[in-house]
From Swiss-Prot:
Homodimer. HAMAP family: TruA (MF_00171). Its EC number is 5.4.99.12. It catalyses: uridine(38/39/40) in tRNA = pseudouridine(38/39/40) in tRNA. It comes from Erythrobacter litoralis (strain HTCC2594). GO terms for biological process: tRNA pseudouridine synthesis. Keywords: Isomerase, tRNA processing. This is tRNA pseudouridine synthase A. CDD domains: PseudoU_synth_EcTruA. Substrate binds at residue 111.
Length: 247
């Protein structure tokens, strides 16, 4: 058996998330079916992160094991040929040691959340960014974001369906930047709780529009209470950017 590592890019709009679902299409299902068509064998895809319905990826790392003489280049070509009906692309394929694991070997994950801050309707970025018509103060959002950086109990910022045993996470980076009408929120950590990034962005948006004071973000954090969450940002503005591994 050979272990192949993939880098996946996908538009999450038509999928019910990355992981296989009983009642709807998933990225995992599409890739596994493409692999079956390419290799004439069943495989199981393992990925560095889990994305919800409508969440996108620029560089999701995944792996599967297969018995084949195909080179990574030819395998990538076959997968992409069978993935054409879907908004999924394999942008890299390589052979990894048999003990390497896309999820368990990962030591860092990064996301970006895109907000388009304008009144005019979105066209190209529809379903690929969150449109906020009210003027946002990105500098206030940046100051509030720094109150969340560090090791904290993020109970307020995780969904009620979160299966993580421990709500304590170390947030390494949360940066807010503006480029014209677009505001991007960058988040980096070893791992995240379910809905954590979207929950943090939602509260930063409230700060940006003046509904919340900057200090209220910290107050919500310290409350350790999901009921104190101000707003959960919609999924379509969120992108899994990259997974980091030991060198």
């Amino acid at each position: 058996m050979t272990r192949f590592a993939l880098t996946l890019e996908f538009d999450g709009t038509p999928f019910m998330g990355l992981q296989r679902q009983k009642h709807g299409p998933s990225v995992q299902q599409a890739v596994e079916e493409a692999a079956r068509a390419t290799l004439n064998q069943d495989i199981t895809l393992h990925s560095a992160g889990r994305t919800d319905t409508g969440v996108h990826a620029l560089g999701m790392r995944s792996h599967f094991d297969a018995e084949t003489d195909l080179t990574p280049f030819r395998l990538m070509g076959g997968l992409n040929a069978h993935l054409r009906p879907h908004p999924i692309a394999v942008t890299n394929c390589e052979i990894m040691p048999e003990d390497w694991h896309a999820r368990f070997a990962c030591i860092g994950r990064s996301y970006v959340y895109r907000i388009i801050n304008r009144r005019a309707p979105l066209t190209i970025d529809r379903k690929r960014a969150w449109q906020v018509p009210q003027q946002l103060d990105h500098e206030a959002m940046q100051r509030a974001a720094q109150l969340l950086v560090g090791t904290h109990d993020f109970t307020t910022f995780r969904s009620t369906q979160c299966q993580a045993k421990d709500p304590v996470k170390s947030l390494d980076r949360l940066e807010v930047e503006r480029d014209g009408d677009e505001i991007r929120v960058h988040a980096e950590a070893r791992s995240f709780l379910h809905h954590q990034v979207r929950s943090m962005v939602g509260c930063l948006k409230l700060v940006g529009q003046g509904t919340w004071r900057e200090e209220e973000v910290e107050e919500a954090l310290l409350a350790r209470d999901r009921q104190r969450l101000g707003l959960n940002a919609p999924p379509h503005g969120l992108y899994f950017v990259a997974a980091e591994y030991p060198r």
